[in-house]
């Protein structure tokens, strides 16, 4: 009985030591090196203000290198998943990406007219175009980088605080393009022990870059000289709104003659598109939603083809530096087939002009 008990004890001890060794191995391999911001300002505003493109630059494919450069001095604290007992043997590495649509060759789509190529400066390396991964910067001991509270980084020399972006024209535009604040790029940081250049765009970014600004074009076109057009559709009997998508009996069609003028400096005809934008009626999306449920407003071209309020276009070819006319028709329709309550109704729409 005692010998058997002894063998059981030996077996249990062996199993116990094996479990301890396996746990110790798992702990030594658990550090990812990935870093995150613990406090401070992790956002860099890339606001280039208001800039104007010369006429020859407002052409598809034109690139404006280093359209805007920045050199900020954000202060923030970074903590990394690393072994604080071996912090002196570590190395910094970086990665970056963008949430914008990737067009290839490091270009990201800002909107239908513009694209950006972003270069970020990390310490010890040349400016690198986004996206990138596994960019090492050599040894740079930070004693508290593995602590939960993190290590303070800051000043204009800190990695990621400086950079630039180039601008590419995807298609020419008229007037102004306003870029509201949008996430342009994200920088990820790693501290690898033992020293290595491994770093990917996973986890939480250390810095996020927000782009904003306004770009003006010297070439310009205008619709009704930029003034508001008011359309009076008169009085209609509510009982006549009975067929979805149809103009009620007795309703009038307003025929609009809208002045259009372009001054682009180009000889010959200018090809333009008038685009219509408004809130669509959920019951009949081809109509503009009005303040009166069951009543919508339809806009057509001169051939009675409906122009969708969700970005429908009216193409025109007009002479440069001369007055021209765009013709549209406007009339009310039923959107539900149910006669609406009596009363006034209103609707608004925006007409934007683009040229090739």
Curated annotation (Swiss-Prot):
Instruction: Give start-end ranges for the coiled-coil region(s).
Output: none
Q: What induces it?
A: Expression is negatively regulated by H-NS and subjected to cAMP receptor protein (CRP)-mediated catabolite repression.
Membrane-spanning ranges: none
Where is this protein chiefly located?
other
* Gene Ontology annotations of biological process type: cell adhesion involved in single-species biofilm formation; response to radiation
UniProt keyword Metal-binding, yes or no: no
Annotated GO CC locations: pilus
What the entry lists under SUPFAM superfamilies is as follows: Bacterial adhesins
**What residue stretch is flagged as signal peptide?**
1-28
Query: What InterPro entries is this protein classified in?
Result: Adhesion_dom_fimbrial, Adhesion_dom_fimbrial_sf, Adhesion_dom_sf, Bact_Fimbrial_Adh_Pro
UniProt subcellular location: Fimbrium
Task: Give UniProt keywords alphabetically.
Answer: Fimbrium, Signal
In its keyword annotation, does this UniProt entry include Signal?
Answer: yes
What is the recorded function of this protein according to its Swiss-Prot or TrEMBL entry?
Part of the elfADCG-ycbUVF fimbrial operon, which promotes adhesion of bacteria to different abiotic surfaces.
Give the note: The operon is cryptic under classical laboratory conditions, but is functional when constitutively expressed.
- Family classification: Belongs to the fimbrial protein family.
Protein's UniProt name: Uncharacterized fimbrial-like protein ElfG
What organism does the record attribute this protein to? Answer: Escherichia coli (strain K12)
């Amino acid at each position: 009985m005692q010998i058997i008990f002894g063998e059981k004890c030996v077996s249990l001890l062996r199993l116990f030591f094996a479990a301890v060794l396996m746990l110790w191995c798992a702990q030594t391999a658990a550090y990812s090196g990935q870093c995150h911001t613990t406090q401070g300002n992790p956002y860099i505003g890339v606001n280039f203000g208001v800039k104007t493109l010369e006429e020859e630059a407002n052409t598809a494919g034109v690139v404006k290198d280093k359209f805007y450069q920045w050199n900020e001095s954000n202060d923030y604290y970074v903590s990394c998943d690393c072994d604080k007992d071996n912090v002196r043997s570590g190395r910094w590495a970086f990665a970056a990406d963008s949430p914008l649509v990737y067009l290839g060759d490091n270009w990201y789509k800002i909107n239908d007219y513009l694209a950006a190529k972003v270069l970020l400066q990390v310490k010890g390396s040349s400016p690198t175009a986004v996206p990138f991964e596994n960019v090492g910067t050599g040894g740079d001991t930070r004693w508290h980088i593995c602590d939960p509270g993190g290590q303070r980084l800051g000043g204009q020399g800190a990695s990621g605080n400086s950079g630039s972006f180039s601008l590419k024209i995807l298609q020419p535009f008229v007037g102004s393009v306003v870029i509201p604040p949008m996430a342009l790029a994200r920088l990820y940081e790693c501290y690898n022990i033992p020293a290595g250049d491994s770093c990917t765009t996973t986890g939480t970014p250390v810095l996020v870059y927000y782009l904003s600004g306004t770009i003006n074009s010297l070439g310009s076109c205008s619709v009704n000289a930029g003034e508001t057009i008011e359309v009076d559709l008169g009085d209609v009997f509510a009982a006549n709104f009975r067929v979805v998508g149809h103009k009620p009996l007795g309703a009038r069609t307003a025929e609009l003659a809208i002045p259009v003028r372009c001054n682009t400096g180009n000889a010959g005809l200018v090809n333009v598109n008038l685009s219509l934008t408004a809130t669509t009626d959920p019951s009949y999306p081809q109509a503009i939603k009005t303040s009166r449920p069951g009543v919508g407003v339809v806009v057509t071209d001169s051939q009675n083809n409906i122009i969708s309020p969700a970005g429908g276009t009216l193409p025109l070819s007009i002479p440069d530096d001369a007055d021209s006319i765009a013709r549209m028709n406007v009339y009310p329709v039923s959107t539900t087939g149910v006669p609406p309550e009596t009363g006034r109704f209103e609707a608004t729409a925006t007409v934007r002009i683009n040229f090739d």
